[in-house]
From Swiss-Prot:
Species assigned in the record: Caenorhabditis elegans
Protein name, UniProt field: V-type proton ATPase 116 kDa subunit a 1
Entry keywords, A to Z: Hydrogen ion transport, Ion transport, Membrane, Transmembrane, Transmembrane helix, Transport
A Pfam family assignment: V_ATPase_I
Keyword Transport part of the UniProt annotation: yes
Gene Ontology biological process terms, A to Z: defense response to Gram-positive bacterium; embryo development ending in birth or egg hatching; locomotion; negative regulation of locomotion; nematode larval development; positive regulation of neurotransmitter secretion; positive regulation of programmed cell death; proton motive force-driven ATP synthesis
Organism superkingdom: Eukaryota
Lumenal side: 444-445, 508-572, 632-699, 814-834
Length: 905
């Protein structure tokens, strides 16, 4: 660690600790081999192509026609897919990953898809026509049946019509405009009237048809008002549900027949029928003709049923055959399309025989990339090998962190804050341990942790089946994607629950308590006899009740019974523990920043950032941790001599919070806990508790304060001085030094010696505000001031922020205790069958509330708090997060994104 190493020369490091080393390479492909080479790179998924034609629109690129052909094939396949889903035919998806077809195979695929689409469209068109004819014939069948009844009723009512009465649907009033259809009131002779009536009936016209049931009331009203009552309307509902002849949707319809007189009314009635989208059908006048037509209609219906069944069978066979290959075809087409999209990123040389690309790729995978190019060249039959040349560049490479299904969830947690700057320390491997651990500190309960662990185990053991099921629910996908994170959170929660000795708010006496009951039974009985006395608290003095040996692992179960001071003890322990964990993680973050400074050869950052930060952190916060541990180790309940001072007992245990305040205020305090006469000082817990404490603390405070101006001004000053020296050196070199160079003419065989000023390359900077270009001192000072203030204030605020570990742990334990006391414990006070039934019922209530409130809600809360502690308190000490993600050309990724987009539609 003491030797500087440049990027690319450092010792091999697993990719999980830093992002993979990347290089920019230039790729030369023969036109004939370019398609196959890109296909092989897509299968490999380790190359990110750069767009060398950023100013060229998508419609002006070389392979735009091929992309359009792929779009058209994809459209046809989506049409086939929709038709297959419409018939509820399962599509075969074996998970097979076919190779990308050759360019010449596109013609065969296009022909296959064109044939399938045309055949299916023709079958659909024929089926639609047949269904329309079938619906029309079905409606005509119902019309012929119903109109026969109508005509029979009209024959009985003829004389009523002739006398001015209306039919069942006709309406008459005494108004002038509502006269009867035929007025023969002036005829006195019965025979003459009969003959005139028969002649009039011969002049009556009628139309018959069907109309949707919900339109019938409005249809009747408009007919009555438009025709002034001079029509005779009869309707009857069709019991069967018919398909609409236009849309094909199932609808309820009614048969109607309208009688009228004259061409004017006929025209008006037809227009009204057309307006209400009623369908009119021809209907013969005589019963014999209607009977013959009905027989013909029934015959045609039966024939249509046969033809329609055959058409549907043929359509089904076509779709079943297509369903076996449609997923594979989609995969092939999408691969072809992605290849041509990638080829559009290439430059084409002037000879049109070579394609040039620039790619980002991992240095460790160059051999595999070259092998893929060789396979592509061999498969294409090209005699010219493909060339991959590494390039020098000042551009920041993309960040590529290798992951697997276990580490992916933790890497996503880190990347959600920001993609790591190229080659800086990756927090993910440390997050794998610290994240579930800090979560468990807040969530610690063996019972709830076991529930979480079992749920995660289910997702892990059934992951293949669950992946194959392709469940689209977003909440499920969130839990399933983080199954390994949940698994570790559950495992660590069981561990911290064991440390807290907490199982559903209860403790387990595994090793035997270190406390003994020293209270006589007579005293206990005395307190239990009287209700008021029973509310008093019995105290176990540690001098007599504690055997001096701590509980082997975790918290002594006796504290679960200590109603009076249980919270005081646990709060003090968890509060100090939170501070220890927080300062330890922050210190580790600062140490990781040293690794970054070493890697990037930033000596100024090491001298004037890392070292002052460690001194500042150690002078105050690490010193506080030492005090916490010392208090736990040396200051017990029993008095004695501690660190050279006489210690009277627990009442003189030092107060660390007030002591820290006095340290900054440099307040004078008593040395030790007792005076020379052996009397205990009043407020002895405020005294100094080891020799030389006051002097040491003054030195630490001064040392911490001195680091602030060092962090603020030292680095900008040395950057400024370095910049001045480089500027002076460049000026002197430009004025005094010249060098000779050779200018050659490629069209002639001679050359000349010329003189030109030497160009001094600018140093590459490794810090903020320096490097290429002039140094802007204002920007450097502002940047340095922001980071200094952020670190100094952050050390205080972040330490306080870690107290959320204590707060959430307390809240979780108290909520668990309330749930046990208020719900499940009530079942234990009942005896017999009533108690058994109550226990059965209350257990399910208790279990449901535990899962939904304590596991899910409290678990989500602890998860978010752990997320904040890592993003802000931990990663702010060393993590830049200013990089961009490596996005390789990968068929697997492209197909997965397409599948996800389909499922979200």
């Amino acid at each position: 660690m003491g030797d500087y190493v440049t990027p690319g020369e450092e010792p091999p490091q697993p990719g999980i600790y830093r992002s993979e080393q990347m290089c920019l390479a230039q790729l030369y492909l023969q036109s004939d081999a370019s398609y196959q080479c890109v296909a092989e790179l897509g299968e490999l998924g380790l190359v990110q192509f750069r767009d060398l034609n950023p100013d060229v629109s998508s419609f002006q690129r070389k392979y735009v026609n091929e992309v359009r052909r792929c779009d058209e094939m994809e459209r046809k396949l989506r049409y086939l897919e929709r038709e297959i889903k419409k018939d509820q035919i399962p599509m075969l998806d074996t998970g097979e990953n076919p190779d990308a077809p050759l360019p010449r195979e596109m013609i065969d695929l296009e022909a296959t898809f064109e044939k399938l689409e045309n055949e299916l469209r023709e079958v659909n068109k024929n089926e639609e026509t047949l269904k329309k004819n079938f619906s029309e014939l079905t409606e005509l069948k119902h019309i012929l049946r119903k109109t026969q009844t109508f005509f029979e009723e009209v024959d009985h009512d003829r004389w009523r019509i002739l006398e001015g009465g209306s039919g069942r649907r006709g309406r008459s009033t005494e108004r002038e405009e509502t006269r009867p259809l035929i007025d023969i009131g002036d005829m006195d002779d019965d025979s003459a009237a009969r003959m005139s009536a028969q002649a009039a009936m011969l002049r009556l016209g009628f139309v018959a048809g069907v109309i949707q049931r919900e339109r019938l009331p409005a249809f009747e009203r408009l007919l009555w008002r438009a025709c002034r009552g001079n029509v005779f309307l009869r309707t009857s509902e069709i019991d069967d549900v018919l398909n609409d002849t236009v849309t094909g949707d199932p609808v309820n319809k009614c048969v109607f027949i309208i009688f009228f007189q004259g061409d004017h009314l006929k025209t008006k009635v037809k227009k009204i029928c057309e307006g209400f989208r009623a369908t009119l059908y021809p209907c013969p006048d005589t019963p014999q003709e209607r009977r013959e037509m009905s027989i013909g209609v029934m015959t045609r219906i039966e024939d249509l049923k046969t033809v329609l069944g055959q058409t549907q069978d043929h359509r089904h066979r076509v779709l079943v055959a297509a369903s076996k290959n449609v997923r594979m075809w989609l995969t092939k087409v999408r691969k072809i399309k992605s290849i041509y999209h990638t080829l559009n990123l290439f430059n084409i040389d002037v000879t049109q025989k070579c394609l040039i690309a620039e790619v980002w790729c991992p240095i460790a995978e160059l051999d595999r990339i070259k092998m893929a190019l060789k396979r592509g060249t061999d498969e294409s039959g090209s005699q010219v090998p493909s060339i991959l040349n590494r390039m020098e560049t000042n551009e920041a490479p993309p960040t590529y962190n290798k992951t697997n299904k276990f580490t992916k969830g933790f890497q996503n947690i880190v990347d959600a804050y920001g993609i790591a700057t190229y080659r800086e320390i990756n927090p993910a491997p440390y997050t794998m341990i610290s994240f579930p651990f800090l979560f468990a500190v807040m969530f610690g309960d063996m019972g709830h942790g076991a529930i979480m662990l079992l749920a995660a185990l289910f997702f892990i053991l059934k992951e293949k089946q669950l992946e194959a099921a392709r469940i689209k629910d977003e909440i499920f996908q969130t839990f399933f994607g983080g199954r390994y994170v949940i698994f570790l959170m559950g495992a660590f929660s069981i561990y911290t629950g064991f440390m807290y000795n907490d199982v559903f708010s209860k403790s387990i006496n595994t090793f035997g308590s270190s406390w003994q009951n020293t209270i006589p039974e007579s005293v206990i009985d005395y307190y239990l006899d009287d209700e008021k006395r029973s509310e008093s608290q019995l105290i176990l003095p540690p001098e007599t009740a504690f055997d001096g040996n701590p509980y082997p692992i975790g918290v002594d179960p006796v504290w679960n019974l200590a109603e009076g001071n249980k919270l005081s003890f646990l709060n003090s322990m968890k509060m100090k523990m939170s501070v220890l964990f927080g300062i330890a993680q922050m210190t580790f973050g600062v140490l990781l920043s040293y690794q970054n400074f070493i890697y990037f050869k930033s000596d100024l950052d090491i001298k004037y950032m890392f070292i002052p930060q460690m001194i500042f952190l150690s002078s105050i916060f690490i010193y506080l941790c030492i005090q916490i541990l010392s208090k736990w180790l040396f200051f017990g309940a029993v008095g004695g001599t501690v660190l050279g001072y006489k210690y009277p007992g627990s009442n003189c245990a030092p107060s660390l919070l007030i002591g820290l305040i006095n340290m900054f205020m440099m307040k004078s305090r008593n040395a030790g806990f007792v005076d020379d006469s052996g009397e205990t000082y009043p407020q002895c817990y405020l005294s100094t508790w080891y020799p030389g404490q006051a002097t040491i603390e003054i030195i630490l405070v001064v040392l911490a304060l001195v680091q602030v101006p060092i962090m603020l001004f030292a680095k900008p000053y040395f950057l400024y001085r370095r910049d001045k020296q480089q500027s002076r050196y460049s000026t002197l070199t430009a004025e005094s030094n010249q060098h000779q160079s050779v200018r050659a003419d490629i069209n002639q065989d001679d050359a000349e010696v010329v003189h030109a000023p030497e160009q001094t390359p600018k140093p590459s900077g490794h810090g903020h505000g320096h490097g290429d270009g002039p140094l802007e001192m204002g920007d450097v000072m502002v940047y340095q001031a922001i980071h200094t203030i952020e670190f100094v204030l952050g050390c205080v605020s972040h330490t306080a922020s870690y107290l959320r570990l204590w707060a959430l742990s307390l809240a979780h334990a108290q909520l668990s205790d309330v749930l046990w006391t208020m719900v499940f414990r009530n079942a234990f006070v009942l005896d017999g069958y009533t108690g058994a039934i109550a226990t059965y019922i209350l257990f399910f209530i208790f279990g449901s509330l535990s899962v939904f409130i304590l596991v899910l809600m409290e678990g989500l809360s602890a998860f978010l708090h752990a997320l904040r502690l890592h993003w802000v308190e931990f990663q702010s000490k060393f993590y830049g997060g200013l990089g961009y993600e490596f996005a390789p050309f990968s068929f697997e990724k492209i197909l997965a994104e397409e599948r996800e987009a389909e499922e979200n539609l």
